[in-house]
């Protein structure tokens, strides 16, 4: 679904584990890494899209995760000119995204990147909370920064709940 301004409706998914690390996936056959994301189909809500994309791209089901938060607003980024397909109608100039923060409640072995007949990702790993902001492709960086700032109050307490006390104790 592309709106009148040329933005495609899309959802983005940040998955966090018990250690406060986030799920980071490599695009199939490429060197670029990103969060799972995907377009909203006609008649779908953002939450329905999120669950569909979560299953298609990561192999996870609703019972494997818990919704912790979602962004208050749709966040936009423009595509670089080289990625805009002017021959398709309507022309898509970028994405507007609703983001979800999910807590993985199932075992990591539930992740199955090859679940789909057309996998989006070929590798994944857990990374520190802010790592993706520095590593994502440049045209998505501002949106990633906004998302991670908005989710920090929800995600970072989860990080510190499970971390062992690293302070040295004095006798």
Curated annotation (Swiss-Prot):
Pfam families: NUDIX. It is an enzyme of class 3 (hydrolase). Transmembrane segments: none annotated. One of its GO terms (cellular component) is cytoplasm. It comes from the Bacteria. Residues 6-149 form the Nudix hydrolase domain. Keywords: Hydrolase. GO terms for biological process: mRNA catabolic process. Belongs to the Nudix hydrolase family. RppH subfamily. Accelerates the degradation of transcripts by removing pyrophosphate from the 5'-end of triphosphorylated RNA, leading to a more labile monophosphorylated state that can stimulate subsequent ribonuclease cleavage. NCBIfam families: PRK00714.1-1, PRK00714.1-4, PRK00714.1-5. This is RNA pyrophosphohydrolase. It comes from Colwellia psychrerythraea (strain 34H / ATCC BAA-681) (Vibrio psychroerythus). The gene is rppH.
């Amino acid at each position: 679904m592309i709106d009148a301004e040329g933005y495609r409706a899309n959802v983005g998914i940040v998955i966090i584990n018990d250690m406060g690390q986030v799920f980071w996936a490599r695009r199939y056959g490429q060197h670029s890494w990103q969060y799972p994301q995907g377009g909203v189909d006609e008649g779908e809500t953002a939450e329905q899209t999120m669950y569909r994309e979560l299953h298609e791209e990561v192999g996870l089901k609703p019972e494997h995760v818990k919704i912790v938060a979602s962004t208050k607003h749709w966040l936009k980024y423009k595509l670089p000119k080289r990625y805009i397909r002017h021959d398709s109608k309507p022309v898509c100039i970028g994405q507007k995204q609703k983001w979800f923060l999910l807590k993985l409640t199932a075992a990591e072995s539930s992740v199955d990147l090859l679940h789909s007949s057309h996998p989006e990702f070929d590798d994944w790993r857990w990374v520190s909370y802010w790592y993706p902001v520095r590593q994502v492709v440049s045209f998505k960086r501002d949106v990633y920064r906004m998302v991670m700032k908005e989710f920090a109050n929800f995600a970072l307490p989860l990080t510190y709940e499970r971390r062992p006390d690293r302070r040295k104790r004095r006798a």
